[in-house]
């Protein structure tokens, strides 16, 4: 792992592929890190210069830089990009890291970021989601709230990489980070209503591809198809899978979808 000090914090990152190839940032969600992309990054590194940054406080030492919000993560990423001297790049984000992706798209504009990719972003929160987030913010009950997410995500799979991510990698993060994550995730949904509303609010809209596997319901697929019919910049792409983690479960299909969208 390499590291940079930017915006008053330490950011660690992995880097692979030809540095002269198009640069692609892989952005995880809260309480995740570069390990989320252990299956996907090598596939994409055949065609891209792949960088997987870890958010502040998500490095191997969980360096404490005080409290922060999701807007801080966007500023950190912009500072990281400047420090690396990267002008042209694309982003692929997962889960609630997608809020950061769209914040950066808004700040840089569609001329610089004509396309972006979001993976398995919860577009339509279910009623139990709010209770999970509330429990996840509680100083003593956060473990139960966190486990509720894990149980939901593990219910439909025996995929070893996904289960390892849920049992070892995500629980590794301290309780303070989980509480912060749930607070910020809830704040974004309360502010914007849904990710579709957030994307629609962009004054300059890039082409946005949503790669997803879950939920399996036809209604969820139809929601996206209906939205795409009225918004030509939105491109839903369903791939086979039974989990919230397609980059771990089905990396070949995810890599193919990314290539086809970015290279079109």
Curated annotation (Swiss-Prot):
Membrane-spanning segments: none
This protein's UniProt keywords: Dioxygenase, Oxidoreductase
Site keyed Increases basicity of active site His: positions: 120
GO terms for MF: 3-hydroxy-4-oxoquinoline 2,4-dioxygenase activity
Signal sequence interval, chain numbering: none
Effect of residue 95 to A/C: Reduced affinity for substrate, and strongly reduced enzyme activity
Record: residues binding substrate: 30-32, 94-95, 153
Catalytic machinery residues: 244
Protein's UniProt keywords contain Oxidoreductase: yes
Catalytic activity field: 3-hydroxy-1H-quinolin-4-one + O2 = N-formylanthranilate + CO + H(+)
UniProt remark on cofactor binding: None. Contrary to most other dioxygenases, this enzyme does not require a cofactor for catalysis.
InterPro entries: AB_hydrolase_1, AB_hydrolase_fold, AB_hydrolase_sf
Any one Gene Ontology cellular component term annotated for this protein: membrane
Keyword Hydrolase: no
UniProt-listed Enzyme Commission number(s): 1.13.11.47
Stated pH dependence: Optimum pH is 8.
Source superkingdom: Bacteria
Family: Belongs to the AB hydrolase superfamily.
Described purpose of this protein according to its UniProt entry: Ring-cleaving dioxygenase involved in oxoquinoline degradation and utilization.
Protein name (Swiss-Prot/TrEMBL): 1H-3-hydroxy-4-oxoquinoline 2,4-dioxygenase
Species assigned in the record: Pseudomonas putida
Lineage start: Bacteria, Pseudomonadati, Pseudomonadota, Gammaproteobacteria, Pseudomonadales
């Amino acid at each position: 792992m390499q590291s940079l000090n930017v915006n008053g914090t330490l950011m660690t990152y992995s880097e692979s592929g030809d540095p002269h190839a198009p640069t692609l940032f892989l952005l995880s969600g809260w309480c995740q890190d570069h390990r989320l992309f252990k299956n996907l990054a090598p596939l994409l590194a055949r065609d891209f210069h792949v960088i997987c940054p870890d958010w502040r406080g998500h490095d191997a030492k969980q360096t404490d830089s005080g409290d922060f919000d999701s807007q801080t993560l966007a500023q950190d990423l912009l500072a990281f990009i400047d420090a690396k001297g990267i002008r042209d790049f694309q982003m692929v984000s997962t889960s609630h890291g997608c809020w950061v992706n769209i914040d950066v798209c808004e700040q840089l504009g569609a001329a610089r970021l004509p396309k972006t990719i979001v993976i398995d972003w919860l577009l339509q929160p279910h009623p139990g989601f709010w209770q999970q987030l509330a429990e996840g913010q509680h100083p003593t009950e956060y473990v139960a709230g966190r486990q509720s997410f894990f149980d939901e995500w593990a219910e439909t799979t025996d995929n070893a990489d996904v289960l390892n991510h849920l049992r070892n990698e995500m629980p590794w993060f301290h309780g303070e980070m989980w509480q912060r994550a749930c607070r910020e995730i809830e704040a974004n949904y309360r502010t914007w209503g849904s990710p579709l509303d957030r994307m629609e609010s962009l004054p300059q809209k890039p082409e946005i591809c949503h790669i997803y596997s879950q939920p399996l319901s036809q209604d969820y697929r139809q929601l996206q198809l209906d939205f795409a019919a009225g918004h030509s910049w939105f491109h839903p792409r369903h791939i086979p899978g039974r989990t919230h983690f397609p980059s771990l479960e089905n990396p070949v299909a995810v890599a193919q979808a990314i290539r086809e969208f970015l290279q079109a």
